[in-house]
Amino acid sequence: MTDDNYLKRKHMKTSRGIRNNNPLNIRRSADNWQGAREEQTDQSFVQFKSMAYGYRAAWKVLQTYYDRFCMQGKPFTVRNIISRWAPPDENDTEAYIRRVLKLSSIGGKENLLPPDNVDGYERLSGLLQAMTCIECGISPQEVDTEAICRGYRLAFPENNEELDKWLQAKDEYWNW
């Protein structure tokens, strides 16, 4: 027999980003996100059908940032990404940057590869994992890294074969 009160308490403690399948808490806008729930009951944040679609949106946001930064002559770094994502008028941007750098092990001035480049997958998936920890208030072990990968596949389906090869090579390296 299930304790309904326990389930209600557990659900109430779950972060908004997890409940919405929106791990980076992407705000509602005029964008018509692939995988968005038909009925949007949260007035502020997009609600997705699955966590994979939430991460698909996150990958697409990163790609948009990359494209904009290139057009503006800015490097694609954690500092520039987070400064755009969590501007100082609404956030403690410097604390957010420090936390992401610590959780992701990405260098502060490291110029990252574009999101649609499989060679940059490991670094950027680490970035998304760190941002999820901050946005959802969870530990790195609680982040659904499989959903990050599925989101990448949904965002960049043309790279699925190359990603499979990369993942297989990484798996073989760690399991020799």
Where are these regions (language model features)?
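Cell-wall polysaccharide-cleaving catalytic domain and substrate-binding groove, primarily
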Residues: M1-W176
